[in-house]
Amino acid sequence: MTRKRILRAAVDVISEKGFKSASMREIARRAEVGDATIYNYFPTKESLLYGYCEEKQREVAEALKKIDDFNEYTLREQLQQLTETELALWLPDREFLAEVFTLTFSAPVAGAVNLAETRRLFNHMVEEMIDAAIEVGEIPDQPYRELLAPLYWDYFTGVLAFWLKDDSQGYANTTQLVDRSVEMIAMVLQTALIGKALDLFSFMFRSQISRHLEKLSDYTAPWKQAKRRFMDGGDG
């Protein structure tokens, strides 16, 4: 498939030369397509970079679907399998992923926009796991459920950043981090602690805002009174 061939060539060239030094022409030549063809699929180098991230999420989803008894895994096991599968599939392209991180964090706003589809695909997998766990009563219904998958995305981004800097043999430190942190996340979900904490913060925030608005009203009352007298006393 032409699209996948272009993406594979982009990964190879960017990994070898870095994002800034890689050229669309060289990627097209490596993919054995014409210069016009590559622009039909990917108008910019950035779209190539982030397009591969999207493709990687589709590969992860397919890999999980091929596990026959995946639906029988506990939520903790599913989240751990997701995280480990991501790392395993990114391993051959670790240098490329480092380029993704460099570009994304050098321009965070643009990076967030460019990663939107990748993030959506990842979050969808997490949402499926959480929803299934709630349906069978493995975990209680979660307040602010829509925030859980984005929070796991943020967590996983941190795992990737840690992994890219991990120089332990076989990335053993990353393995330990994932084992311990996923266990903690599963425990938090079983107690619906995130929702309860957000409820508490929401209550405290509303209370503080209410108090400050009352004080603000006291401060602004004289101004409003003075302004009314001024408006009422003009010649017009």
Which residues fall in each region the model found?
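Soluble, non-transmembrane catalytic domains of enzymes that act on hydrophobic metabolites at membranes
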Residues: K4, R8, Y50, F101, ...
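Short amphipathic alpha-helical elements of helix-turn-helix/winged-helix folds
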Residues: A9-V13, L89
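Hydrophobic alpha-helical connector segments
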Residues: G51, K65-E99, S106-V109, V113-L121
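Acidic/His metal-coordination segments adjacent to aromatic residues that form catalytic metal sites
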Residues: N71-E72, A132-D141
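C-terminal peripheral helix-coil segments that are non-catalytic and often amphipathic
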Residues: K165-G236
